[in-house]
Amino acid sequence: MKISCLKVGGRTIKTVVAVFLCLMTGIIRKSDTAFYAAIAAMLCIQRTAEDSLREAFNRELATVIGGAFGIMVMVFEKNVYRIPCEIVRYFLLSVLLIPIIKFSVLIKREKGTFLMCVVFLCITVTHGNDEEPFLFGFARIVDTTIGIVVALVINQFPIGRGIKPPYKE
């Protein structure tokens, strides 16, 4: 009876290498947000270089737009008015998804709507109490850009049909 192991394909290997490199950039940069670079890299490693480039463009644009909306809200809250009631704040943050969604439709980038909203909420919900929310928003955009660049570079390397681990008989 043969028990074959799972085949590890080229795209899987590229993804692992890209994630590792992104996490290493976090060590080099002394950043605790390299996780976002790794996510971007995973999303941008696609079957072909063309598909990767398309995904990278969509990802970068969505991150910049969601990040810009998030940074605007955080700067407003820090400098003008911070809603003291958490329930009301969360309600308003949810309502603020409407202009983000409408903007994505306006610029005909509906495919990036989900990511725009995720980045916006990531900045406004998880970092609402940061001393410098602008820095996190900016770091979030930089990390995504790093992940995209790493993925695009890694995806240029041709990797064969995969590595097949030995199987038992």
What residue ranges belong to the model's regions?
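Alpha-helical transmembrane segments and their membrane-interface boundaries
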Residues: M1-E169
